[in-house]
Every structure is written in structure tokens, then in C-alpha cells.
Amino acid sequence: MLLASAVVVWEWLNEHGRWRPYSPAVSHHIEAVVRAGPRAGGSVVLGQVDSRLAPYIIDLQSMNQFRQDTGTLRPVRRNYYDPSSAPGKGVVWEWENDNGSWTPYDMEVGITIQHAYEKQHPWIDLTSIGFSYVIDFNTMGQINRQTQRQRRVRRRLDLIYPMVTGTLPKAQSWPVSPGPATSPPMSPCSCPQCVLVMSVKAAVVNGSTGPLQLPVTRKNMPPPGVVKLPPLPGSGAKPLDSTGTIRGPLKTAPSQVIRRQASSMPTGTTMGSPASPPGPNSKTGRVALATLNRTNLQRLAIAQSRVLIASGVPTVPVKNLNGSSPVNPALAGITGILMSAAGLPVCLTRPPKLVLHPPPVSKSEIKSIPGVSNTSRKTTKKQAKKGKTPEEVLKKYLQKVRHPPDEDCTICMERLTAPSGYKGPQPTVKPDLVGKLSRCGHVYHIYCLVAMYNNGNKDGSLQCPTCKTIYGVKTGTQPPGKMEYHLIPHSLPGHPDCKTIRIIYSIPPGIQGPEHPNPGKSFSARGFPRHCYLPDSEKGRKVLKLLLVAWDRRLIFAIGTSSTTGESDTVIWNEVHHKTEFGSNLTGHGYPDANYLDNVLAELAAQGISEDSTAQEKD
């Protein structure tokens, strides 16, 4: 065992034998489930934190990621890195792919690039870690040494990965990416994890058909191109170590990875566009199912049955000796295969009824809600705030710091005792001024805070990038629409003693404004009007009043890419969950749900909306 502090990065093994990191948000979610222990069920539903990963479940006992619609299994691991490395600072390095979107580098590649960047080297050669690329920090470009093709790279900030302190386990059984040539070979293990990992690596080495044909060293790096660029910088320097060749006046330090292998029994990203785990074409899943024992298969089957109902499709109960669990009919066969492999008898029964809407209600039965004025609200286009510069806005929330602490500004990653490293359009403040946010006490270059404010919604509010404390009144970019609300004389499941509050949202399609992702481009509005339901209880009315505040602040909806259909430039929910299923809970968006009201209050509070905050605003 090793006593140390480290950041935890959860990673999955792709079909080319490379470990790909989950985003910081996903890693935090997995760690939370691990800390919850047996009461969490031993499985992690990734779609709960990232809707793009809705098909995936992680089984913490077998350390496998399970794709519900195909049955594909991928090994996962819990890896530790130095807190001073990129994941410990929330730094993400990404390259621009052919579609114009950004793909994060493998974690150890990103750490190597960040280390060179912090040492102020002009460029770094990645050849010695298996990639024929040069990263030029002056142009923020990646150059293919063979074809001279250049792509843009970027460095951005995200959440810091979860931190652990104390006793960390030593390297465990299963193999990972090969280390230096001098490292002695590890003896193979016969556990399911090792068998699965070795089958993936063997397929890569043997050049199997399908996606496994791609070379290991080219995965997660841009494909070669044909663009001819000027000659590379001088290459007289010799490689310094196996973690990356850095061309520049300073020597590189060893890799900042604490350990390259993870425990099979854990003890403790968005990145913007995270590379999603591979889809149905992989052969790994077929190999992996044969490696799991009855207990693991049974646990995966139960976890899948519990989660698939959130897909929104009418369900088919799959019965076994212990009862029944509903699953998506298109996926019931997958569950049946898993349960049969676990030795459980399987049969299909008639699906329960999906009840999306209440019984018909006449106009005379619709009543206003006691204590809530009116029965509808409208929002129009955003009104620009006039007369206040970013510097004037920030002045309300900041205290100047005459003697800055000797630590990094987490926006530009330069020392607070040095000028800001921000290189964009020049704010009017001096780059060496430092300020402390009044409530949370976090310290930044004022220059960096002004730049961050200018890149945001410019609504007079500020959110601390470290702890997410909101200063001022946060507003969103919700397009114009209407919100109606009233009482109907029916009860929700789980709330038999009260009527129901029905909310109807109506947003028409239109043209995106300057605050939206693609100004001047049209946006769609699918599924409107949207009907949502709350119990007419004291807490239900409290939620409604706060939802009205969120609506007025344009925080209920946004314009983006639908996680359900993949359509871009469309109206989507904005992190405040609503119940759209009236009389059942087959989709996961209905009742009964004992925790829903508390959960939505927490989501609203994260947007700066609570009874206390609204009372302070009125004062």
C-alpha cells in the first residue's frame, strides 16, 4: 500500500487497447457510488450524469462497462495521477477533428503536453511515447511528422478530477499500456478482467477484422492528411525520456502518473465532447460475455433491467424466479441472454400500461393555484443590460488583493504573483491586478475574470469557476415562449391526498440570437407543448414558485444538441428535471418518485434559485 495524495481518473479500454478517460463529472459520479458502498447496488448508471452515455452501466465488482443495447463489455479501471498534473488542475488538451469538434487526448498524452506547456517549452515531440506528432505551443497546432498536416489544438479548463488522500493500493493484476522497454514483463492472470483485457490486446496485435485493424499508436490522434506545411523546428535534441521528447531550453521531468495500473476492487468528462465508448461493431463484447461468471452476469442483468426503463419506450417485463423487471422491448433479448447465461429461467409477459396524460379535464375543472398569481407567464427576447462595463459589474463582487498568495490562478494557470496569462482581446484592467471573490474567497487575476465575464452571458452575474458560487442573478438563453400552470382534479401516483399542478410549456421555432450557439441560424422546437406535473402539496407549490423564477430568468430551456435524437440547434431542457409522465413511471420521468421534489429543489439551487436567494433579491 502507498501513502499519497492523488487525483482519481476512471478510464475504459477501447477496442484498440488504449485507456480512454471518462470526463471529470463522470469520474466524480463513479466515485460517489463507490463511496456509497453496497447500498448503491454495485453498479453505476453513466446516463445519470451525462445523457450522451445513457446506454452504459459500470459494474464495480467485475470492473466492466456494459453497453445495454448491444451487450458489449469494456474493462474499466480506477487510475491515480499526481495532483500537480493536468487532471489535478482541471486542464484538458484537445485536438480538432475533421468535423470541427474537439477530441481530448489520452490522459497520459495530455499530462505530457501540459508538463511541457508549464515549463514554457516552445514545442514537444510525442514520437517517443508512440505518436508521430509535434505540438507547437506558439501556433497551438499539432503537426504530423510524416505528412506535415497540421490541426488546431486547444487547452481548456474543466472540473478537477476527484482527489483522494491516504492509503492507495499498489498496482494490481490486469495489464495496461506497456511501460519502458526495460520493464520486466508481468505474469498473466486468469481473472475475468485480465482475460478480457488480453483478448482486446491480442486482437489488436493479430490485426482482426473490423475496427480492431487500426494501429494502437494512431487511435485518439488525428488521421494523416496531405497538407504541406513549412519545415518543423530544429530537431537536433535527443529524446530525454519515454514520456515525450521536449524541444527547448529546459529538461523534461518524468511522467507525472503515480501508477499505471488500477485495482480491480475500487476503494474510493465534458469534457466538452468526450469520446463516447465504442458502439455495436466491436468484437470485444462477444468475447467478454463468455469470461463472466454467473454472479457477474446476474448482477449486470438486474442493473440493466433497472435502468433501461429510462429510455422512454414502452417496456416488457422479463420474469425470473425472483420477480420481474421491465426493460425496453428492443433490448429484452439482451437481458434475456444475460439472465439465461446466469442460469435464470426467462419468459416475457404483457407490458404494463404507460400513462403519459391525465384523464380529460373540462375548462370548468381547471382552477388557479392558491398563493400563485396569474395562470401563465411569457418570456421575450433577451434585453441587453446597459450602462455597466464588465469592470463595473465585477467591482461589486471583488476585493482587491495587494499581496497575492503564491499559487496558481485557476483560469489562466499562471502564478497570481505574475501577470495574467490570458492572450485574448485586451480588457482595460492591468494584467497583474488580483482580486478575491467576496463570498467564497477564491482568488483570481481580475484580468482573467473580466475575460471570463466577456465570454459568458454578460447578464451582470458571475459564477466562481472553482466552487460554482453565483454572484448576482444568473440568467440563461431560453428562447421566447409561454408557461401555463393550473390545478387539475386528479392525483399523481404516490400523492393520493392532493390534486395535481399541470405546467404547459410552449416554445415556437425561431432564429437564434447573439447569445445562442449559432446566431442567425434557425432553431427547431420539438415536442411542444410539453406537459409536466407536480403534486399540489406545500412542497409542490414551493417548487412551482421557484420554477416560475427560473422561467423568468430564462433557465428552464436552452438551445443545443438533443441527447435523445442527436439533433443540433434545437430547444432542450437545461438541467432542471421535469416529470412528463402523469400516471406511471416507466420512462423514469413519472410518479411515484419520493425524491423528485428534493432533487429538483437542489437543481434549482445550483442555478442560484432558492427561497433565500429570491427573498434577498426582493430586499
UniProtKB/Swiss-Prot annotation:
Broad class of enzyme this protein falls into: transferase
EC code(s) of this entry: 2.3.2.27
Keywords assigned by UniProt, alphabetized: Cytoplasm, Metal-binding, Notch signaling pathway, Repeat, Transferase, Ubl conjugation pathway, Zinc, Zinc-finger
Zinc finger region(s), RING-type: 409-468
Keyword set includes Chaperone: no
Subcellular location field: Cytoplasm
Reaction catalysis annotation: S-ubiquitinyl-[E2 ubiquitin-conjugating enzyme]-L-cysteine + [acceptor protein]-L-lysine = [E2 ubiquitin-conjugating enzyme]-L-cysteine + N(6)-ubiquitinyl-[acceptor protein]-L-lysine
GO MF annotation list: ubiquitin protein ligase activity; ubiquitin-protein transferase activity; zinc ion binding
UniProt cross-references to SUPFAM superfamilies, sorted A to Z: RING/U-box, WWE domain
Biased composition (Polar residues): 261-273
Basic residues bias spans: 378-387
InterPro entries, per database record: Deltex_C (IPR039396), Deltex_C_sf (IPR039399), Deltex_fam (IPR039398), WWE-dom_subgr (IPR018123), WWE_dom (IPR004170), WWE_dom_sf (IPR037197), Znf_C3HC4_RING-type (IPR018957), Znf_RING (IPR001841)
UniProt KW Manganese keyword: no
Main location: cytoplasm
GO biological process terms held by the UniProt record: negative regulation of innate immune response; Notch signaling pathway; proteasomal protein catabolic process; proteasome-mediated ubiquitin-dependent protein catabolic process; protein K48-linked ubiquitination; protein ubiquitination; regulation of type I interferon production
Region feature Disordered, mapped onto this chain: 238-281, 358-389
WWE domain span: 1-78, 79-155
Pathway: Protein modification; protein ubiquitination
Gene Ontology CC terms, in alphabetical order: centrosome; cytoplasm; cytosol; nucleoplasm
Subunit structure: Interacts with NLRP4.
Comment block on domains: The WWE domains are thought to mediate some protein-protein interaction, and are frequently found in ubiquitin ligases.
Family from the record: Belongs to the Deltex family.
Its biological purpose: Regulator of Notch signaling, a signaling pathway involved in cell-cell communications that regulates a broad spectrum of cell-fate determinations. Functions as a ubiquitin ligase protein in vivo, mediating 'Lys48'-linked polyubiquitination and promoting degradation of TBK1, targeting to TBK1 requires interaction with NLRP4.
Protein name: E3 ubiquitin-protein ligase DTX4
Originating species: Homo sapiens
